[in-house]
């Protein structure tokens, strides 16, 4: 709800945003986001079009006038190739699904990113497999401003080879102090919530 409230304010109070793309897992894109819009009175003026299903259904959804266009991440590459709409804001729901810089969805979002004024990434596991995951995610958020434009730059700054066979490196480990340095770099655009901050346990 917090993200949708912010979108509503940007769209109808400050008029800074006109069309928003939301990318998420299929069930979340198809069910959760539209349900949140229906649930809260202050969000009822926001309209959405859910871009899922067959190619025909997706094309029809893109032709429908809406404030929010919600697509499942598996169809992001298709959307970037077939959609002529301009989005001035993007929400990546489950940002960690963009952690692989070799994946087609990362490349599609990277190409779209310079055209977008605002971007928000939501995730419960930003570095599920370690700090190396963070580079691709923040490359999309700030276009390389904080952790570098290239993975090699990030790797050389904060990591050292771990498992290797001669000149072939299989894995990397953080340099001493790297974790704190990385978190300090991204702190100004990162909000981290702990369960203990907002859950009342019995």
Where does each model-flagged region fall?
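Conserved helix-turn-beta segment of the N-terminal RecA-like "Helicase ATP-binding" lobe
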Residues: 28-53, 141-144
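Conserved Walker A/P-loop ATP-binding site and its immediately adjacent core
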Residues: 2, 17-39, 128-133
């Amino acid at each position: 709800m917090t993200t949708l409230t912010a979108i509503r304010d940007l769209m109808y109070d400050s008029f800074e945003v006109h069309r928003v793309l939301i990318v998420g897992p299929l069930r979340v894109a198809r069910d959760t986001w539209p349900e949140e819009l229906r649930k809260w009175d202050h969000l009822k003026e926001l309209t959405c079009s859910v871009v899922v299903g067959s190619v025909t259904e997706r094309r029809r959804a893109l032709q429908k006038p809406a404030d929010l266009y919600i697509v499942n991440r598996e169809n992001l590459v298709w959307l970037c190739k077939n959609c002529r709409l301009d989005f001035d804001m993007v929400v990546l729901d489950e940002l960690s699904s963009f952690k692989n810089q070799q994946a087609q969805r990362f490349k599609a979002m990277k190409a779209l990113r310079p055209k977008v004024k605002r971007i928000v990434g939501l995730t419960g596991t930003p570095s599920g497999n370690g700090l190396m995951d963070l580079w691709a995610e923040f490359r999309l958020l700030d276009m390389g401003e904080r952790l570098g434009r290239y993975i090699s730059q990030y790797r050389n700054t904060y990591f050292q080879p771990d498992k290797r066979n001669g000149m072939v490196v299989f894995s990397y480990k953080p340099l001493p102090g790297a974790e704190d340095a990385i978190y300090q770099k991204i702190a100004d655009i990162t909000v981290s919530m702990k369960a203990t901050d907002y859950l009342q346990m019995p």
